[in-house]
From Swiss-Prot:
Family: Belongs to the AspA/AstE family. Succinylglutamate desuccinylase subfamily.
A Gene Ontology molecular function term of the record: hydrolase activity, acting on ester bonds
Residues the record marks as active site: 210
Enzyme class, first EC level, given as a word: hydrolase
Pfam families from the UniProt entry: AstE_AspA_cat, AstE_AspA_hybrid
E.C. number(s) listed in UniProt: 3.5.1.96
Biological process (GO), any one: arginine catabolic process to glutamate
Pathway: Amino-acid degradation; L-arginine degradation via AST pathway; L-glutamate and succinate from L-arginine: step 5/5
Function: Transforms N(2)-succinylglutamate into succinate and glutamate.
Protein name, per record: Succinylglutamate desuccinylase
Membrane-spanning intervals of the chain: none
Assigned keywords, A-Z: Arginine metabolism, Hydrolase, Metal-binding, Zinc
Co-factor note (free text): Binds 1 zinc ion per subunit.
Length: 322
């Protein structure tokens, strides 16, 4: 199964759906779903996902290279792994999504969207995670969902962590720093993301890794993310990664800007970078007689997007943590 990406993009079902790799067994489950199980017993389970948005190709290429290293035997596997290429049709078309944004649908929220390939895929992925986690006795559960951002950023690589009732494990946060993430953003409320689903329903330590900017296949400079790729290789093979000399900056979400109607106006232009700072009192958005302003001394914007569909998030506002 050294042609997993090509099969996924072509929508082709392989003639052989399971086999042996170098020290592990592989099983093709469905388009964009591949399970890897080490020959030796392990108590760690990892979801490695990318391509939830079809125009975010750099992480997909990274996963493809990791799979090649595993199949060649140059990388040893020490986790049970479920590799997920989230939205095969959008990946093949080179577009963000075909009908609706899948990363708003998880946790059953797909039921509130018009039925589409994305709603069916979200349901399939939920069931795939349930089967994967229930079929093992993993003491450690991680989910790393790899993305790229639409906009440029003051932090080239950063992580977004779902709301979690329990404290985050220091080893997990330290690994994210070792993977080259310059900032970590902590959600304070539940959401429909893939990582919130895996965290809430299966207790996984989950993070959305944002790695640079969305570009088509073949146009990515993967050397920008070599530190992340090296950290993933070390993780898969069970090698300790050195702690980052510059721990990631930490932010928490303090508010969400939502577009409710066609009257919505977001006062940020196309050049506004993620993590741009705004002073207290700055007018951020208007919609009819509703005004959205900065309420803390300084707030930082994340994922500003005035073109989202009505009812969806047009941006997050953050505050820096000490």
């Amino acid at each position: 199964m050294d042609n997993f990406l090509a099969l996924t993009l072509s929508g082709t079902t392989p003639r052989v759906t399971q086999g042996k790799g170098a020290g592990f067994r592989w099983r093709w489950l469905s388009h964009g779903l591949l399970e890897l199980t080490p020959d030796a017993p392990v108590d760690r389970a990892l979801i490695l996902s990318a391509g939830i948005h079809g125009n975010e190709t750099a992480p997909v290429e990274m996963l493809d290279k990791l799979l090649s290293a595993l199949y060649s035997g140059s990388l040893t596997l020490t986790w049970r792994v479920l590799v997920v290429l989230g939205n095969p049709q959008a990946l093949a078309a080179g577009i963000r999504y075909c009908h609706s944004d899948m990363n708003r649908m998880f946790g059953g929220r797909w039921q509130s969207f018009a039925e589409s390939d994305e709603t069916r895929r979200a349901r399939e992925l939920e069931l795939s995670l349930e089967t994967f986690f229930s079929s093992g006795q993993a003491r450690v559960r991680w989910h790393l969902d790899l993305h790229t951002a639409i906009r440029g950023s003051h932090h080239l690589r950063f992580g977004v962590l779902p709301q979690r009732d329990r404290p985050w494990e220091t080893g997990f946060l330290a690994w994210l720093g070792a993977a080259g993430l310059e900032a970590l953003v902590f959600h304070q409320a539940p959401g429909g993301t893939f990582t919130h689903f895996s965290s809430e329903h299966f207790g996984a330590l989950s993070c959305t890794l944002e790695l640079g900017k969305a570009l088509p296949f073949g146009q990515n400079d993967l050397t920008q993310f070599s530190v992340t790729s090296q950290a993933l290789s070390a993780l898969l093979s069970g090698v300790e990664t050195s702690t980052s000399s510059s721990p990631p900056l930490r932010y928490r979400v303090v508010s969400q800007i939502t577009r409710h109607s066609d009257k919505f106006a977001l006062y940020m232009d196309a050049q506004t970078l993620n993590f741009t700072a705004f002073a207290k009192g700055t007018l951020l958005a208007e919609e009819g007689d509703k005004r959205v302003t900065v309420t803390h001394d300084v707030e930082y914007v994340l994922f500003p997007n005035p073109s989202v569909a009505c009812g969806l998030r047009a941006g997050l506002m953050l505050e820096r943590l000490p």
